[in-house]
Curated annotation (Swiss-Prot):
Domain of life: Eukaryota
GO (cellular component) term, any one: extracellular region
UniProt note on tissues of expression: Expressed by the skin glands.
Compartment(s): Secreted
Protein known as: Maximins 4/H3 type 3
Keywords recorded for this protein, A-Z: Amidation, Amphibian defense peptide, Antibiotic, Antimicrobial, Cleavage on pair of basic residues, Cytolysis, Fungicide, Hemolysis, Secreted, Signal
Residues that bear Asparagine amide: N70
Function text: Maximin-4 shows antibacterial activity against both Gram-positive and Gram-negative bacteria. It also shows antimicrobial activity against the fungus C.albicans, but not against A.flavus nor P.uticale. It has little hemolytic activity. It does not possess a significant cytotoxicity against tumor cell lines. It does not possess a significant anti-HIV activity. Maximin-H3 shows antibacterial activity against both Gram-positive and Gram-negative bacteria. It also shows antimicrobial activity against the fungus C.albicans. Shows strong hemolytic activity.
Main subcellular localisation: secreted
């Protein structure tokens, strides 16, 4: 009779242990599902905030671009416009990343190439003109 009690108690303990393990697995899977849902909600909220921020920045950039486009521009205003255009391109590339690279290669127009060339010219010609000026100044002093 003792043997039957030992087997019954052992069976009871084993079944109780199996039920607790099963409940632990279920609670872990439920916890995982809840965490996944909360992460989706957070991502959704982040996406909404990001799109609202992009829209606000685009609006601000357009307002500033219109302000600078209507009047006469100084060199500083021209640089501000270039920066605004770059910001607009960056914001557009966030919306459509595939089209951004195509737009950037098309946007590299003749004016930008000319600007790059004149900057390089100034870097090269500045020191050369300085040397020529010094040489001519030295010759004039020797002659005079």
């Amino acid at each position: 009779m003792n043997f039957k009690y030992i087997i019954a108690v052992s069976f009871f303990i084993a079944s109780a242990y199996a039920r607790t393990e099963e409940k632990d697995v279920q609670s872990l899977s439920q916890r995982d599902v809840l965490e996944e849902e909360s992460l989706r909600e957070i991502r959704g909220i982040g996406g909404v905030l990001l799109s609202a921020g992009k829209a606000a920045l685009k609006g601000l950039a357009k307002v500033l671009a219109e302000k600078y486009a209507n009047g006469k521009r100084t060199a500083e205003d021209h640089e501000v416009m270039k920066r605004l255009e770059a910001v607009m391109r960056d914001l557009d590339s966030l919306d459509h990343p595939e089209e951004a690279s195509e737009r950037q290669t098309r946007g590299f127009n003749q004016e930008e190439i000319a600007n790059l060339f004149t900057k390089k010219e100034k870097r090269i010609l500045g020191p050369v003109l300085g040397l020529v000026g010094n040489a001519l100044g030295g010759l004039i002093k020797k002659i005079g």
